[in-house]
Every structure is written in C-alpha cells, then in structure tokens.
Amino acid sequence: MPTINQLVRKPRKSKIEKSDSPALNIGYNSHKKVHTKIAAPQKRGVATRVGTMTPKKPNSALRKFARVRLSNLIEVTAYIPGIGHNLQEHSVVLIRGGRVKDLPGVRYHIVRGALDTAGVADRKQGRSKYGAKRPKG
C-alpha cells in the first residue's frame, strides 16, 4: 500500500482498455493516405480468400471463413455464420465484431443478408441473425 506522499509524487495510472475488434476502430483518409481514429460498428470489405479452417481441440469441424481487406486497408479473418454461403473471392461483405472461441485469430463475423452475402436459406427461427426473410404463408 503506497503512502499519501508516494501517491502525490507519482499518481496511479488508469488501466488501458484494449479493444476486442481493433480493425473497426481505425478509419482511412484516402485523400491524405493516412489512418484515422474513427470507431465504427461495422465495416465494408472485399473477400480476398474464402476457405475452411479446423477448430482448436476438443472440437472437430470445418468452419467457413473469409480473409477480408477492409475499406481502411487492413486485412482481417472473418467467420461466415450459418449453413451454406455464396461468398467467393472479390465478394463485397460487411463485417462486425465478435470472435469465434475455437478459431484462433478470428475476431470478426460477416453479416449475413448484407451487400453480396445472401441470407441463410430455409431458416425458420433466429432469422434476423442470418439475414433470412420471413417465410410465406
């Protein structure tokens, strides 16, 4: 426990909060070619690679992912949620924050039903999370 005198000489430092999705907190000024500090809830990007990845131990699957070059020129790995997708190289996608616990290095999710990404077909429940329209009838 520090004394009052020690605290007067050297005050306590406040804890620095680290972002879970740092690429969303950076903007880009293409006119000046400089990165700016502008936070955004989502960002647009272009898929540079689409593939599958295997999760960490105890799980076993082929998880779909896309490598995305964002509008701020940062390249990130994003998870493609839902069953089946229509993404390929050069597809324009919208990403949001949110990691995938069993895929190391995947800190972002692709938003289904936005831009070039189609919603999940034949989805009856939890449709809003997968960009699925309300079924007729």
UniProtKB/Swiss-Prot annotation:
The modification 3-methylthioaspartic acid is found at D102. GO terms for cellular component: small ribosomal subunit. It comes from the Bacteria. Signal peptide: none annotated. PROSITE patterns: RIBOSOMAL_S12 (PS00055). Keywords: Methylation, Ribonucleoprotein, Ribosomal protein, RNA-binding, rRNA-binding, tRNA-binding. Disulfide bonds: none annotated. With S4 and S5 plays an important role in translational accuracy. Interacts with and stabilizes bases of the 16S rRNA that are involved in tRNA selection in the A site and with the mRNA backbone. Located at the interface of the 30S and 50S subunits, it traverses the body of the 30S subunit contacting proteins on the other side and probably holding the rRNA structure together. The combined cluster of proteins S8, S12 and S17 appears to hold together the shoulder and platform of the 30S subunit. Part of the 30S ribosomal subunit. Contacts proteins S8 and S17. May interact with IF1 in the 30S initiation complex. This is Small ribosomal subunit protein uS12. It comes from Streptococcus uberis (strain ATCC BAA-854 / 0140J). The lineage of its organism: Bacteria, Bacillati, Bacillota, Bacilli, Lactobacillales. The gene is rpsL.
